From Swiss-Prot:
The gene is korB. It comes from Methanothermobacter marburgensis (strain ATCC BAA-927 / DSM 2133 / JCM 14651 / NBRC 100331 / OCM 82 / Marburg) (Methanobacterium thermoautotrophicum). The keyword Disulfide bond does not apply. The lineage of its organism: Archaea, Methanobacteriati, Methanobacteriota, Methanomada group, Methanobacteria. Optimum temperature is 70 degrees Celsius. InterPro entries: 2-oxoacid:Fd_oxidoreductase, THDP-binding, TPP_enzyme_TPP-bd. Its EC number is 1.2.7.3. CDD domains: TPP_OGFOR (cd03375). One of its GO terms (biological process) is sulfur compound biosynthetic process. Keywords: Oxidoreductase. Heterotetramer of the KorA, KorB, KorC and KorD subunits. Optimum pH is 9. This is 2-oxoglutarate synthase subunit KorB. GO terms for molecular function: 2-oxoglutarate synthase activity; thiamine pyrophosphate binding. It is an enzyme of class 1 (oxidoreductase).
Amino acid sequence: MNVKENPYLKYLRRDRLPHIFCAGCGNGIVLNTFFKGMEMAGVDFDSIAMVSGIGCSSRIPGYVKCDSLHTTHGRPIAFATGLKLANPSLNVVVFTGDGDAAAIGGNHLIHGARKNIDLTVICINNSIYGMTGGQISPTSPEGSFGTTAPYGALEDPFDLSELVRAAGASYVARWTAAHPLQLANSIKKGLKNRGFSFIEAVSQCPTYFGRKNRMRSPVEMMKFMKENSINRRKALKMDPEEVEGKLIIGEFADAPRPELCDRIYGMIEEKSGKIDIIKSAYRDD
């Protein structure tokens, strides 16, 4: 039997395979949608630079055949900001997770959005710390179980997409691993947006979140995400009681505004007239 090869294998470092992800993990689905979105956006793969922090999702760039930075916990957006300011011609993509981005990296997240620097941040939200043993994260639903919450989480979770929208990101969307086509389309829009783009990919972690919350099967978890989701356009017309406990998906912001690199280089050019000298370091000649 002839087996057709995945067309996106050309973007992977095959010598790094097999990957470390657990069976049923959603990270592979999200990476696949990234490649699809990148091709849909017409972005040159050679212009991609990936940045990540610490966590399961942050291991993704190591498998991709592009320049990448594997940085310290919670700091990928800070590193990515420096990279983008130094070389604005790059398409800088951040892969991060709910713990990396919303806990130790929370301030970098909101200030990156506020500054509207041209980064595409893909946050894989599985509502738990997967790499370190199943601890509760800032997005764990109230009442969910984890290593640090044997009697259930007592704290209200962050709504990451609403948080980043309120902080000023010019493009924000949330989908799940069970919505790959929509996710790929939002990644395309994020890559084409000149500004801070935040794409939240709600994903399954069967090893820790699933096992500790009586959803052992990845299929069961994906079915739950699919059936428990409601589009934001529809949710905004419903009473709060009707959407309680639902996963709100869709676009949260699509409002272009001036981008940080453009502002900084514009100011330099206006005040000194030396913008060509500064940018010459990144020219082929």
